[in-house]
């Protein structure tokens, strides 16, 4: 499923299926006339470029890390080799449960390993408590939050764009619907197709997690350090959080990610909630990338019970190792899809600002921050958009702080 793409709001996803053309760096090494193997004192063969040699060394290092985590999984199991491999297969089966042919067909591979790729992250409002509740009996759980992430292993950079769940989208034969209805209409595969067309980019991977899974993952990491922007009092989200730098456990992290009514006085609560979700995800990424093999193994084990993804254990460890070195302070860009709220027949909808959306996605696809400025709400301390420019983000004292990038 190789593909190329054109970025644009509401653009149809049309992908070239031709075989990839090798990069120039894949060509044979070029030596000057008269040079002999002995005259080139390099640790790599004259038939291999230095870039390829370096890439191979990094690949070997990554394989060692993957092996270390797999060994850690064996230690966790404390069983024979056969039992350990069966255990890893069980984890893979848990991770891929519900990943059918339709879903894999909706995903589009990158041309080369290591290329930047898009991943759709979905948080559903399901939990064991809700499943057993009469209030939610028979309901299809909705994608309560969606983040379109661009991940670039080569430049160690991640861009997260939150998608407003109430965005009104034309879903063809299904009519005009809120974005979060896509999951209840056609599951993850349909949601991927809708978001891909809406954003004008191919989506290569996806992950879906519910409330319980999120809490378990954070707890498996031993909690995550987060600078909570403001005091949270939101019973609907689960309770109270103090403001300030602190280590959040799974329950506390979920409160921050769900808190919406705590921001009623500031305007669109969903926008602030999405910003906090990106804040927590950045903290999770920082913790995972600095984890030892045992902790990473425990996290994958915990995740596998609640997360659904096209990745397997090896994929997850390989991606984590390739992203080691990511500076989570400056290497993570973030923003939210630009929309305008409108009340229609008693229901609130978000209408995308198409020109701004197209410009944002063009910047994202070029590896640039989605916005040209940081946006920080000084009243709540919430970072609504980040360009990775931490130094400039505090240079303005207006109600919304900005820093041009």
Question: What is each model feature region?
Answer:
Residues 180-242:
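Amphipathic, coiled-coil-like alpha-helical scaffolding segments used for oligomerization/assembly
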Residues 50-155:
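Entry/capping segment at the start of metal-dependent catalytic domains
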Residues 132-137, 177-185, 200-205, 243, ...:
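Second-shell loop/turn segments in exported
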Residues 96, 129-130, 311-405:
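C-terminal solvent-exposed extensions
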Residues 219-295:
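Flexible, polar/acidic helix-loop-strand segments at domain edges
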Residues 143-145, 176, 188-196, 211-215, ...:
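Extracytoplasmic/secreted envelope proteins and their assembly/folding machinery
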Residues 114-117, 141-146, 155-158, 163, ...:
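Extracytoplasmic
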Residues 1-51:
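N-terminal targeting leaders characterized by basic, low-complexity, disordered sequences
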